[in-house]
Amino acid sequence: MNEKDLLTRWEERIPDADEPSYMLLMALCAVSSHTAALEAVFDKTLLEDLAIPDSKQYFTEAVSKIPARFSAPQDFDYLRSFGLLTVYALQSGNNNDLHRYLGMYHALVAEYGFHDESRWPDDISLSEVDDRRRLFWCVYRLEIHSSCVFGHTVRLPEAQVSVYYPRITPTMDPETQAWTIGWDYITDVFRLLEYAIFGLRACKNRKALLAVLCDRPSPTMLLDSLAQLKASKSRTLTRLHDPDSEFYSNRCRYMAVQISCIETTTTIMALLYCQAPARDVMAVAEKFLKKLSSAPLIMFKIASSQIVHQLLGVGHMLSNASRYDNDQYRTEAKRLIAFLGDLVKSLESVVPAAGSAGDKLLRLAEANT
């Protein structure tokens, strides 16, 4: 939701319980209270003297309002609600709920063509067009993330999508413009990550007649596309770490961490797809870990389970890479995975999923002995 809508939407009244807007409000409260309970906010004064309700109550209330049949299926609030319920499930570590509500979201997308802007209502405002674009790509990124981490299929490949990115307008302040530029860049990297996933997982026993119609991208093409994307990165994004920059806000600094994580994940997956030398994979991981270890703790709090999932994925990819080149990099892989495990384990007090993920990484490190 855009900030203005968020501030004014429910200012005057709470909607009736049978309205889609009420379901959206409850889903939003579930995600917000879960975040507040973890103190995953940049300004802790917002939580002072605040009794934080149980997020499960809001979640249960939102779920109870899902209709058996959608009388107004084009209502944008249903799509927003399912997106937020999916986020809540991911944050809570409930994969069953994640697939349930992501599936409901995709059911509405499929039935009413949300993946194609030409099928959207003609009478919506430019502001709602941008909101719809933002929601679509946010859920797309969430699905690619969960597909990468949990191994499920990508339900809506980007090749079948006809949705633009939200507009960058002259009325935006410089910080918001920088954030939007970064948001677009991250989405581009996720779209490349989808092809890396496809390259690594593509069906190996497809009939020859069909195989020629759905060739995987060549390894060099994938790496070249990633290199071109990085090379064309806006100069604005290179200034997010500069304390003297007008873009040195909390959310832009957090975005810089996000960019580093998704670039590393995509690069390593592309290298694995190319069967690149293990030393190349280790070098990328080492550079990433040095940068990540200097990030403030609050950035990990804000990222929550998503960054833990990504770090666990990096550990598994390092383990796979260590088997190349006659196992000569197993010792190096063990060192890096153990470092990852210790880093993730240290987040246990602020990210609930970190404890078990850290243990998995440490066991994985020992397995590489």
List where the protein language model places each region.
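Structural signature of alpha-solenoid helical repeat junctions
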Residues: 20, 24, 74-77, 127-131, ...
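Transcriptional activation interfaces
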Residues: 1-19, 54-61, 109, 189, ...
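Fungal transcription factor middle regulatory core
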Residues: 110, 114-118, 123-227, 290
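Residue at a conserved register position within TPR or TPR-like alpha-solenoid repeats
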Residues: 89, 147, 269-271, 318
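Cytosolic regulatory protein-protein interaction regions
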Residues: 211-291, 320
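C-terminal transcriptional activation/regulatory domains of eukaryotic transcription factors
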Residues: 1-94, 174-177, 238-256, 274-276, ...
